[in-house]
């Protein structure tokens, strides 16, 4: 995408670039199936490439830019092409986030509904950053649950730190949860959070505590980039 202020080195992808990237995604899915994986997830959040297509950074004027459905066409294309190559039994998940990274919240909901109606995905995974966060008095969680999922399972992520919170999410209609921070801080998080009195470690944490949980030095160094996570 072009249009990012202050980065003259950024150029808009050509249509040939997009075809090449789509082929790479599809080939990765094909290899995953050959290696015994049950499915793949297309990551359309956190500022990654597919997220940039959905965001306001996308200033394209061709079929991959303009309205939100055009911006998201690359994701629809990928779902269809992976389904064709890998078959009906191969699981395809898409991760989206309704905010941050230059995303327009209402646009994301419109695209998500379009994707669900399309009927080709097996899971929609919402990265909410904080499942309890409210906007104008309404939780983001309740907003994503207003969509019609057409029977598609839904999962959420975002500061899920206890068995009690997981139980509440299930009661709200969530089918499964995605654990990030909790699993980084506790390698056995699902088992640990069932113990009476369990609480997730407060941030920041020491690098040694992360090594104890089995994280590599490379990953710990990566986590140092997250403000307030690793105590130096």
PLM region spans:
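Flavin-dependent oxidoreductase catalytic cores
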Residues: 1-232
